[in-house]
């Protein structure tokens, strides 16, 4: 028997895509006990779309949050935590964070729940994502123990042990949760047999991409990234996007010179650096030529052993079913 689960979706101005996400969840063979969609000051019609579906399904709830005067990347954690307050007293065994711009097949969550049943040491699971350009993480580099923040499914004990999502203005709250889970002895794993489609294209303008690269460099320093690992990341990015790699390195150096405050405990920094050096050692021993090719975070999806990603089939077509049950 599969464990029961709840979902929380922080959403801000997701009217363009959130209906695809709702239809994907409604079509699941195993539905959540509760799904709280937290509208974080949305003004584009997101709320009205959610209300339409929630009116016929008691397990879907819209939670509206007022618009905050200060906008930063901690907003996702604040919105998630508001939703968490609505479900934490319920009976469930798994809790998931789900972005509001995804679509996936009807067995997506039953598949992940099954993986948690198979291995009691797994605390966090997920799948790869791809966007319309068929790009995803290069797991030859980041490793299959990395779980994208687009959809993270936690065993309840794991989520409570790590203290949930900690708001950090620089962002990366899902990454902090991932590292903390491993530090506390839980396994984390991405399973490439399935995938989800990430509909929103991030940083489509070149200046947006460069700004994101610089910010990622700042975040790498703030989260205690080892200088040698960062050097590898910069070189790796430059193979696909030279300017992106340069801006990544510039962000790291800028943060180091400015001594940007590190918002995570020292033990997490130390643990993260040990992991990075272990991974870098494996990459070097395995041959650098095997992993150099595409960008670190936007590698061609052929690096993932998933025929859906390689051929652009199935879930990547984002073809939601036409009829969905109302219960």
Question: Where do the PLM segments sit?
Answer:
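Short beta-strand/loop segment that forms part of the nucleotide-sugar
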Residues: 32-41, 63-67
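A conserved acidic beta->alpha catalytic loop
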Residues: 39-48, 102
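Active-site nucleotide-sugar/metal-binding loop of Leloir-type enzymes
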Residues: 77-94
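Non-catalytic, C-terminal membrane-associated alpha-helical segments of glycosyltransferases
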Residues: 211-306, 317
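Conserved nucleotide-sugar donor-binding
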Residues: 148-163
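Conserved donor NDP-sugar-binding/catalytic core segment of glycosyltransferases
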Residues: 103-138
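Short beta-strand-to-loop acidic/aromatic patch adjacent to the donor-nucleotide binding site
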Residues: 91-103
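Short, acidic, metal-binding catalytic loop of nucleotide-sugar glycosyltransferases
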Residues: 23-32
């Amino acid at each position: 028997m599969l464990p029961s689960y709840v979902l929380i979706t922080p959403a801000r101005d997701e009217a363009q895509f959130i209906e695809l996400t709702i239809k994907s969840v409604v079509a699941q063979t195993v539905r959540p006990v509760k799904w709280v969609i937290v509208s974080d000051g949305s003004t584009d019609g997101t709320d009205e779309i959610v209300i339409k579906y929630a009116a016929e399904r008691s397990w879907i709830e819209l939670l509206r949050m007022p618009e905050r005067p200060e906008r930063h990347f901690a907003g996702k954690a604040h919105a998630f935590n508001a939703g968490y307050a609505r479900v934490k007293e319920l009976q469930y065994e798994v809790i998931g964070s789900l972005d509001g711009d995804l679509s996936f097949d009807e067995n997506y969550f039953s598949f992940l729940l099954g993986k948690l049943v198979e291995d009691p040491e797994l605390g966090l699971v997920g799948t790869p994502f791809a966007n319309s350009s068929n790009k995803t993480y290069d797991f030859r580099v980041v490793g299959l123990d990395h779980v994208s923040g687009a959809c993270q499914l936690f065993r309840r004990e794991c989520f409570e042990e790590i203290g949930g999502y900690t708001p950090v203005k620089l962002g990366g709250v899902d990454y902090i949760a991932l590292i903390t889970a491993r530090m506390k002895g839980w396994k984390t794993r991405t399973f490439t047999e399935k995938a989800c489609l990430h509909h929103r294209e991030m940083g489509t303008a070149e200046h947006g991409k460069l700004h994101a690269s610089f910010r990622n460099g700042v975040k790498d320093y703030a989260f205690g990234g080892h200088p040698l690992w960062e050097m590898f990341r910069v070189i790796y990015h430059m193979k696909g996007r030279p300017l992106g790699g340069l801006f990544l390195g510039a962000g790291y150096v800028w943060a180091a010179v400015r001594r940007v405050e590190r918002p995570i405990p020292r033990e997490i920094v130390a643990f993260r650096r040990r992991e990075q050096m272990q991974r870098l050692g494996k990459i070097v021993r395995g041959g650098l030529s095997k992993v150099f090719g595409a960008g670190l975070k936007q590698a061609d999806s052929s690096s993932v052993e998933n025929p859906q990603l390689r051929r652009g089939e199935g879930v990547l077509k984002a073809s939601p079913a036409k009829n969905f049950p109302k219960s």
